[in-house]
């Protein structure tokens, strides 16, 4: 089936307070974010038309703008309302929502002191990120040569557009070698994350996940930790070295887009989709379809 370009679709996109026809939601060529990566975004999922963890994502977008020294005139409630409106007007059941704040075209050059921060929200049907086969058999990862940077080198806890450059390079490298995605190490050589998801492994029935000190502490990551604790599964947030992957019984990835996706291969190491992964995944899938008051 041919891919439908994202700039040529039916529907509507919320842009700076107005709901525009999808194809008319455009920015100028000299937009600062296009040249310098000065943007912050979020990714949310809705299930049966209900957005999961909406407040948390809206607050994180505001905090990301603060980290990027971007003065945004919208509140978290404004962002949440725009997301809800985008889902409603596009009649989305199970789908994905992408809010994006970016610096505009008022000023060109590295400095952006005079540039206005814009906000847009798109929503579209998107049932699965990795696909049904990956869900059953696990995705295949290749360790990337690109490293996650130190907190001294970049605002690593912001979901900033510019930080995804190395993720794109890593994913292309993996796909060209026949893998699904990359496993990225950090600047110290420790296991960090995938290009757009957090990493968990199971050892002796307990969960281990890298300490989120140089990458995004994902909202789904924190949700999975809560699920595990409620199930009585011990969780270790710690430094994980690549050689430890040989002793992992199960591995899985978590993220808003990825949800809970098992990992079947890392380089030349293979893993089964085991009972802990299935339990966590099943609990998460039940939670995302609960009313907001019960899923909190």
Identify what each model region corresponds to.
Residues 1-85, 89, 110-296:
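Helix-start/capping segments and mature chain N-termini
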Residues 102-107:
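Short, internal active-site loops enriched in acidic
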């Amino acid at each position: 089936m041919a891919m439908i370009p994202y700039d040529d679709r039916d529907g509507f996109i919320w842009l700076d307070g107005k709901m525009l026809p999808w194809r008319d939601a455009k920015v100028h060529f000299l937009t600062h974010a296009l040249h310098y990566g000065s943007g912050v975004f979020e990714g949310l999922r809705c299930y049966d038309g209900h957005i999961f963890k909406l407040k948390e994502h809206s607050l994180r977008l505001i905090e990301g703008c603060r980290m990027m020294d971007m003065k945004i005139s919208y509140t978290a409630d404004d962002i949440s309302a725009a997301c809800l409106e985008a889902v409603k007007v596009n009649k989305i059941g199970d789908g994905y929502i992408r809010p994006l704040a970016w610096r505009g075209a008022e000023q060109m050059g590295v400095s952006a002191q005079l540039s206005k921060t814009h906000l847009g929200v798109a929503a579209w049907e998107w049932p699965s990120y990795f696909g049904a086969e990956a869900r059953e058999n696990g995705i295949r990862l290749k360790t990337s040569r690109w490293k996650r940077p130190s907190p001294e080198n970049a605002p690593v806890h912001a979901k900033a557009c510019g930080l995804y450059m190395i993720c794109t390079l890593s994913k292309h490298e993996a796909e060209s070698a026949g893998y699904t995605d990359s496993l990225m190490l950090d600047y110290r050589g420790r296991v960090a994350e995938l290009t757009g998801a957090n990493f968990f492994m199971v050892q002796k029935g307990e969960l281990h996940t890298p300490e989120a000190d140089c990458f995004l502490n994902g909202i789904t990551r924190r949700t999975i930790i809560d699920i595990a604790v409620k199930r009585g599964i011990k969780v270790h947030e710690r430094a994980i070295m690549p050689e430890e992957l040989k002793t992992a019984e199960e591995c899985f990835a978590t993220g808003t887009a990825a949800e809970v996706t098992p990992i079947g291969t890392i380089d030349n190491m293979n893993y089964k989709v085991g009972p802990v992964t299935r339990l966590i995944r099943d609990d998460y899938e039940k939670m995302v379809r609960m009313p907001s008051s019960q899923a909190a």
